[in-house]
Structures are given as C-alpha cells and as structure tokens.
Amino acid sequence: VKLSEEQKFVIKEIIKLKKSVQVLSGYAGTGKSTVIKHLVELLPNFAVCAYTGKAANVLRSKGMDAKTIHSLIYKAYTDEDKKVYFSLASSLDYDGIIVDEASMVSEGIYKDLKYFEKPIIFVGDHGQLEPVGDKFNIMSEPDYKLETIHRNAGEIAHFAEYIRKGYKPSSWEVRNGGGEKIKFVQKNSHKSACMNVDQIICAFNKTRAEMNSFVREKLGRKTSMPEKDDRVMCLKNDRLCGLFNGMQGVVREIYADDMFLFESENNALSIYYDPNIFNQVKYEIDHDQEAPSPFDYCYAITAHKAQGSEFEKVLVLEQRCDLWDHKRWAYTAASRAKELLYWCDM
C-alpha cells in the first residue's frame, strides 16, 4: 500500500517516541490500520491490542498479531473453588504497546496500561461521540490527526464523512444514486429490515428496549428473561471476571439461580446475572463488586454503546437529541457498518 504524505509524516513523528503516551486520531477511511501495520514493522517489539476481540480480529485479518487489551495485560488464576479470576500481570515482555479503538479505553484500563511504564501509542477516531458521563476521554486532544479520506475507502466511509460534515443522509441518495452498500429504509418499514442485520443502532434507550423485545418475539422467545442463544451485552467492567462494559456474546446455557454460560469472542464464562436489568429503559446498575453482573439484550444498542465496534450489516434508526452533537452521532452510527448499511430517518 502506497502511503500518503499525511501517513508518512505521522509515522515518522510517532516512531521518535518523544512522549511516553502518544495519541493518533483518524476518521473512518483515513488509513489508520495501514499506519498501525507500518508502526508494527518499525517498532518490532511493540504489542498490538484492542479493547474488543472484534477489533483485534480486524487487525489480525490485516496480518498483525493483535490481542485484546485484557489478554495482554491481565493474567488468569484459579482459586480453590476452581473459579477463574484475572489480575494485572506483574510485567510485560514488550518494549511498548499500540492500542487500537482507543476511544473505548476507560480511565481504569488506561491506568493499568500505564502501570508497565512502557511507551503507549493510542489510535482512535476523534469524530466519534464522547463517552457518556465519563470525564475521561483519551481522544479529546490527539497529538496527530489523519483527516484525508482515501478514495478507495469505500462507500460507507464516504457516506459517514458526508453526514459528519452536516449534509442530510437523504441527499446522499439523490447525489450518488443507489449504491451497493447503503440502503435507505422508509420510516414505517424499519421493522422489516431488523431481521436482515447483525446490529440495530438507535439513539434512545426506549427504542432500544422496544426493538430488542420486537426481535426476540420474532425469534420465538417465550419470556422476557434470557433464553439459550440470546445475544446479550455486559453493562459494567468487571476485571476480575474478564468482563467489560459493551462486551457482546451469546447465552449458550441457562442454569438455575440466575446463572448462564456467556460465550464471548474471547472465552465462555459461567456468570451470575442480574435478572432485573433486562429490557429496562433506564439501568439501575449496582456497582458493588459482589453484585451479580448486569447484562441486557443487544440486538439493538445505542450509538454510544456501539462505539469502537464494527458489524457486517447494520440498521441505523436516526433519532435526534439535544444532549449531543447530531453530526457526530450519525457519523458514529454509520461508520459501525462494514458491508451493508440500512438507514432509516425516524
């Protein structure tokens, strides 16, 4: 891949390692992965990792030996009852760390990464939404920015840029004709598109709860409680158990006493879940370490929860709210889709 001048400059500056923590930010389609690949070649003993297994898989598909942050810096141990726990590794056999999808890194994980006193390069996207309720945001002041969308970045990246600049999604169709990867859905027919996608993204929790109930009903679920093969998402970080806020997986078995086997991209864990959280519009999460883990269905999620994840086929239900910048919201939602994007103005 031929590097642009912008990419060359960024790579040249970063490898000088002038600061212990450097932040590189780039919009979707600016070639961040290409830059990471070159950094890995120039800094051979740097570990490459990402917050989710999904993001690590994307890097692996591009030829990098990527891990999740969790598998890189936490080590598993088993207690007398054969329960598996995780604790921070005592040392790291690398000269430094490159972290992709850095917008998802919480303050706690940031501190754990810094513990090893190695140079860290965070890579993320300053166009995405700011984390909700979290004052901490690695991407708020990047050292370097990639802002040129590459011609071959694909239709979805160009569409995401178009709406980030404030243009109406509906005018894209008029301007560009019907593309292969973006389909516009009429307001009343969004439910028919639901079952054709891997992820529904909306703005409001009320819509999220409604859409999750609708999809589960279509799938033949009999109760509001989790059943085998339900898709669920963890709602709080629990480093000890290896769970992270926003981590998606599938229920493989249901046990007595509100316990299920949760299979994520990393592993399968038997977990006590909180039955009162499912289908709630507003979550009342108990942050006590001893409390059962909060999960909810994730057929539909909000754009804030979708940050940093990528899905093959996505349905976006566009909804406006004064609490955040709508252009950033729409950009974040659109850029989650990899192969096919259905867009519905609600």
Language model features by range: what are they?
Residues V1-M346:
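Conserved ATP-binding/catalytic motifs of P-loop helicase motor domains
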